[in-house]
Amino acid sequence: MSRRRFDCRSISGLLTTTPQIPIKMENFNNFYILTSKELGRGKFAVVRQCISKSTGQEYAAKFLKKRRRGQDCRAEILHEIAVLELAKSCPRVINLHEVYENTSEIILILEYAAGGEIFSLCLPELAEMVSENDVIRLIKQILEGVYYLHQNNIVHLDLKPQNILLSSIYPLGDIKIVDFGMSRKIGHACELREIMGTPEYLAPEILNYDPITTATDMWNIGIIAYMLLTHTSPFVGEDNQETYLNISQVNVDYSEETFSSVSQLATDFIQSLLVKNPEKRPTAEICLSHSWLQQWDFENLFHPEETSSSSQTQDHSVRSSEDKTSKSSCNGTCGDREDKENIPEDSSMVSKRFRFDDSLPNPHELVSDLLC
């Protein structure tokens, strides 16, 4: 097995199609006003709220550096654009409005998701404010988006609560999947093996350097459901080594104390996804037919007012907790420790609604194999 360095010039699984959306070379500032609201920051990108001068519409401007650690990474950015274009008809994926380019950056003008990350819903402060029916609706929407991607042979590979946004927080809006910087195209001709992702969300096959499949995303959906329902992170340890051990051994707490307010159907759903063998995980399509999700459809058909009132009861608590999202951790476990290291000390108050930085230390120095 040959090994090669993981760099922007030799990453496998990137879409190579030329973007259909025009990449404008005009000055971005001639068309948009940047507000003082910074939505997120990483090592190679920053997202800021902006307003169209012609329409007054709010957007999120994602500034991506074309050179990273001395390497030309324009192909990676074009891949992200291509994935967003491919998914433009899917309402569960963030919409790409325009693209600008200058000498050092490519700027993606994205739909503005005012509700922020669903990570805020994982916080213990909101444990009684988000009902299981709310979680069911969100998980079902995530599955709809992931099913669309998988049907087009795209795996996201960085699904986590920080990369799922809400169109609004009150009433509880619809989800928008963001950050396709780590996504890859999979096919029948080649096997893709890469070490990538955020430590506590890595699937066992990633740690074992086994082939990446759509099942890798399904593992992450299991984690997201677990966090939304229990307000704890299932695998995070005191350090990365302990976290990796928990993942490789699938050490998950299903105790009565942790799952006291979680239904058996929800527990079954999570347990079906958090299994070590990726071939035994259900697909997104199969998950959409799971009894847990179908139960919500049945109840909402006859009692739609319950779902509405559930979302409305969140207003005061959600608004008061929203600003805590960037500073709070889920019982000290839900925070993305690697990402926090990339936020400047003077930006501690910045809301991290977007995550797009490389989650593992020095990922471009890790190894990638493409077996054809």
Curated annotation (Swiss-Prot):
Q: What class of enzyme is it?
A: transferase
Q: Which GO terms describe its cellular component?
A: actin cytoskeleton; endoplasmic reticulum-Golgi intermediate compartment; Flemming body; nucleoplasm; nucleus; plasma membrane
SUPFAM superfamilies the UniProt entry points to: Protein kinase-like (PK-like) (SSF56112)
State the post-translational modifications: Autophosphorylated.
This chain belongs to the protein called Serine/threonine-protein kinase 17B
Q: In which tissues is it expressed?
A: Highly expressed in placenta, lung, pancreas. Lower levels in heart, brain, liver, skeletal muscle and kidney.
Tell me if Nucleotide-binding is a UniProt keyword of this record. yes
Q: What's one GO BP annotation on this UniProt entry?
A: protein phosphorylation
EC number assigned by the record: 2.7.11.1
Q: Where is the Protein kinase domain?
A: 33-293
Q: Which PANTHER family match?
A: SERINE/THREONINE-PROTEIN KINASE 17, SERINE_THREONINE-PROTEIN KINASE 17B
Q: Active-site residues? A: D158
Which keywords are on file for this protein?
Answer: Apoptosis, ATP-binding, Cell membrane, Kinase, Membrane, Nucleotide-binding, Nucleus, Phosphoprotein, Serine/threonine-protein kinase, Transferase
Residues of the region (Disordered) are 305-362
User: What does the subunit comment say?
Assistant: Interacts with CHP1; the interaction induces CHP1 to translocate from the Golgi to the nucleus.
Q: Which locations, inside or outside the cell, does it occupy?
A: Nucleus; Cell membrane; Endoplasmic reticulum-Golgi intermediate compartment
Q: Please list the residues that bind ATP.
A: L39, G40, R41, G42, K43, F44, A45, V46, V47, K62
Note one Pfam family from the annotation: Pkinase
| Role | Phosphorylates myosin light chains. Acts as a positive regulator of apoptosis.
Q: Which InterPro entries match?
A: Kinase-like_dom_sf, Prot_kinase_dom, Protein_kinase_ATP_BS, Ser/Thr_kinase_AS, ST17B_STKc
Which species is this record about? Answer: Homo sapiens
What is the top-level taxon of the source organism?
Eukaryota
One annotated GO molecular function is: protein serine kinase activity
Q: Where is the composition biased (Basic and acidic residues)?
A: 316-326
Reactions catalysed, semicolon-separated, are: L-seryl-[protein] + ATP = O-phospho-L-seryl-[protein] + ADP + H(+); L-threonyl-[protein] + ATP = O-phospho-L-threonyl-[protein] + ADP + H(+)
Family in the record: Belongs to the protein kinase superfamily. CAMK Ser/Thr protein kinase family. DAP kinase subfamily.
